[in-house]
Amino acid sequence: MSVIKMTDLDLAGKRVLIRADLNVPVKDGKVTSDARIRASLPTIETALKQGAKVMVTSHLGRPTEGEYNEEFSLLPVVNYLKDKLSAPVRLAKDYLDGVEIAAGELVVLENVRFNKGEKKDDETLSKKYAALCDVYVMDAFGTAHRAQASTHGVGKFAPIACAGPLLSAELEALGKALGNPARPMVAIVGGSKVSTKLTVLGALSKIADQLIVGGGIANTFVAAQGNNVGKSLYEADLIPEAKRLLETCDIPVPTDVRVATEFSETATATLKPANQIKDDEQILDLGDESAERLAEILKNAKTILWNGPVGVFEFPNFRKGTEIVARAIAESEAFSIAGGGDTLAAIDLFGIADQISYISTGGGAFLEFVEGKKLPAVVMLEERAKQ
């Protein structure tokens, strides 16, 4: 995958437009989780240190396109950046006709979704973004799967279009895990629905030496073995697909599970064999035996790709399976890559972020890359690198 990297360019005196992912949760005008901004800081600081005239922009939330809405303003992000950077930082609301900017200054361009045509990758808007800069830096992996004006169109018209350090690292880590993985490679796909992850399972079944399923996805596999799953979340119409995957891949299906008679935080967990579930029960977690069997598999892995929890870990009584699996990944010597919102929440809960080799910032983009789909932003950067 050959793209121009920001780190290979001399940015001194250049107008640099960075498309970052600053889509953070905001409450009462304050940023409540700064992970995405923190991840973007090194890119911004590198450009500032080189004496570039730096602009950074992002989307935030889902405002009505083309309309200014204070609720979705990047102002809280600007205030956060003022605290963290020694450089002067200001917000520009009207910037499509040009921005006055000094070297070593950071100008945050207001929410791109306030601009009509952003989501449709409008060419006129893309050219306006491109006219603002000498160098366009795509650094938002989380939106790389969307062809929009600020993530894709602008790169076609900017004098130079390159990948920022965050995007480069993401592509490198995914390439390492999927392109030429150290073996054995183990892939864990959890979460609630098989249908949304079927293509992922199919793609991974061709790459991984061992496929592991968890959560609602595993329930469909338990049912595919002819077991009653009671009120469990599962997808009856996908049982034939689960059977096909079981025939072609070695997938360890849970042999024991934790069940409850209601889906609630206070529900009592009952540990039982997976083939003895009653009609009024639902599977909410793996049993100890099943979780330990997965931990054993993970211990011997050389590459681990983790997407999705293996139980309803948000409920304390149904957390154990995900915790056993998470700690096994953390303690493994394998190159481990984790992605997806629920996965990141589990990593935070168990405090193992430092023990995962690479944590992906992209949800949908992460899954599409794993499926083998071409991400529009990456395709654009590759094409620009050839010119």
UniProtKB/Swiss-Prot annotation:
**S-S pairs:** none
Q: Which Gene3D superfamilies match?
A: Phosphoglycerate kinase, N-terminal domain
What pathway does this protein act in?
Carbohydrate degradation; glycolysis; pyruvate from D-glyceraldehyde 3-phosphate: step 2/5
The answer to whether keyword Zinc-finger applies is no
One cellular-component annotation, GO: cytosol
Q: What does the record list as GO biological process?
A: gluconeogenesis; glycolytic process
Family per record: Belongs to the phosphoglycerate kinase family.
How is this protein named in the record? Phosphoglycerate kinase
Keywords of this entry:
ATP-binding, Cytoplasm, Glycolysis, Kinase, Nucleotide-binding, Transferase
For the ligand (substrate), the binding residues are 21-23, 36, 59-62, 113, 146
